[in-house]
């Protein structure tokens, strides 16, 4: 398995050497972060001090948690400040012109390293990650890929090492896709057996899962439809990891009107997953969307999380964007939601199962490159609520230069903890194109957070974050001539749209 992976990587990275055309986009960013840590501490239960309502505290005023029968109680106290300086470099490469029409190579790789001595920044191991790396053969009716790939569908994002084939039937407007390979862990470009995922401990699979899927798509003038089937199998136990099917589609019955929706069914678990139905109407000056949604989280059968019977929620959401004047844009968003019954007995606690959230905002084009944006948000839901506002001012005198200053405020009280978070944030960021192939970026942010609570754990969480970056484009070949600067700045080039 590792041999095949390195063969694919060598073939892809060797592409620019033998190809007639290539494109390499190198995005390097460094951050400097200063943040407060916490320390787990304990105290003898006999040394705690009760308050008037039965709560227990340490002699110096920290609220503690005591398990029945335990000699010691635990609590968190203020820890030392940490400084981290993560450096992340992402390379996106494509090569073509190997002497075979339609043959190309593609790779996206990431290198991360913490320049500080603390080593407290998460996600730095392993230092090198191959996100994608595959050879592609594409002609009018056929596209075939071999290597590390990431496919997006109604079932989410699927990463695997293997092969994928798409067959197109232009007259029928039908595309058929099939793929097979060794799966990657969800949300990360690592196999599920990687040591970086060792917190799974005894639940970590001993072998990589085998993933297979089929997808059919019809794309017409007035709409489209897709059907997806996907299964994952653990070869060590010869058991299903997941098996799901999904359908989705959209229709455009008239100019400006789009109706779309879809649903998925978890065959392995035997229940319906997520579903949604939305209606969008757009004119020159106003756009509105109304969406009904049902969401249920999906967990693979090898994990322990499925045993907790994840509860779905249903929501109704609406958004409106209007432009009453040429230089003014208004937008509003609102949503109400409700969780299904959890079928859990809580005789001593009453809790909420529904909530709502909303947002109002405006964007003003002040002219001569100036843009002003601002808005307010409000949310009330199970366990917490929030009230906030924010705004930004952007100056972009040319396409090659932009600088923004922004600030926001958020008040977040918690229902089940005697703690209220008040967060204030201010910062700036900007970028400039030195030429068509080099772009520099920089920024700084200050987060000022206080926890209002009646014990000694109400300490300050204020931190600074400073960023700097450089994007460099190396290219050769007629296919890249006359590309707009906005396309060159995209993380995935033209394919990122």
List PLM regions with ranges.
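Positively charged n-region of N-terminal signal peptides that target proteins for export
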Residues: 1-5
